[in-house]
Regions:
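A "functional boundary" signal
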Residues: 1-203
Length: 204
């Protein structure tokens, strides 16, 4: 998220996956998937982003193939894959399975609940969308990783739908920016910069 995507890929290319044990191979494919996903999001164009997304999906398929079937991680990534293929109702089922027994202070909880929020937004269920965004935002705070994507989305949702709560939306977004700056998370800072002006202007 600091912008060193090509360097990350180059480092991964130095690894011979045939020498990895099962657990390390999971981390290997997950790192590739994440790097290409973030690179595509960072590029946000019509030339390079589609190429990176294609690579991301290839490594996502590889990751799913090596995860233990029925595990929380396997169900989560199946949900992600189905979501990306616009099979939202099926994605919801896998996300819900992935959430079973996962405590709020585990990173996977935030990932799954954020995925569920996105699914419900596609299904037009805005109450559930907000419900799971809040769950994801709470988990982000419990896990000290300085990741506040859910809080950003919640701020924007409040701004657009709660005319009397602009100050709360502004507070959430400011908090997200502080965390992004703390970790020099350029991707999140760019995202916030796009949303930030309209909320700040409304608040002033």
């Amino acid at each position: 998220t600091s912008g060193y995507f090509s360097e990350s890929i180059q480092n991964l290319e130095q690894i011979d996956s045939r020498t990895l044990n099962d657990a390390t191979r999971i981390e290997y494919y997950a790192a590739y998937e994440w790097a290409y996903s973030m690179w595509a999001e960072y590029s946000n164009d019509k030339v390079y982003a589609p190429r990176y997304y294609e690579k991301e999906m290839l490594y996502q398929d590889s990751l799913i193939s090596v995860l233990p079937t029925g595990s929380s991680l396997h169900n989560y990534w199946k949900g992600e894959n189905l979501y990306r293929h616009q099979r939202y109702s099926e994605a919801e089922k896998y996300y819900q399975k992935a959430l079973e027994g996962v405590p709020v202070n585990v990173r996977l909880y935030a990932m799954v609940t954020y995925g569920l929020a996105l699914v419900y937004s596609k299904l037009g269920d805005w109450n559930e969308y907000e419900h799971y965004l809040i769950k994801a935002a709470i988990s982000d705070q419990v896990c000290p990783l300085k990741e506040n994507l859910a809080l950003q989305e919640l701020a924007l949702y409040i701004f657009k739908n709660r005319s009397g709560e602009v100050s709360r939306a502004n507070r959430y977004l400011n908090y997200s920016m502080e965390d992004a700056q703390f970790y020099n998370n350029r991707l999140r800072m760019l995202e916030i910069a796009k949303k930030f002006p309209s909320i700040v202007l409304s608040y002033q």
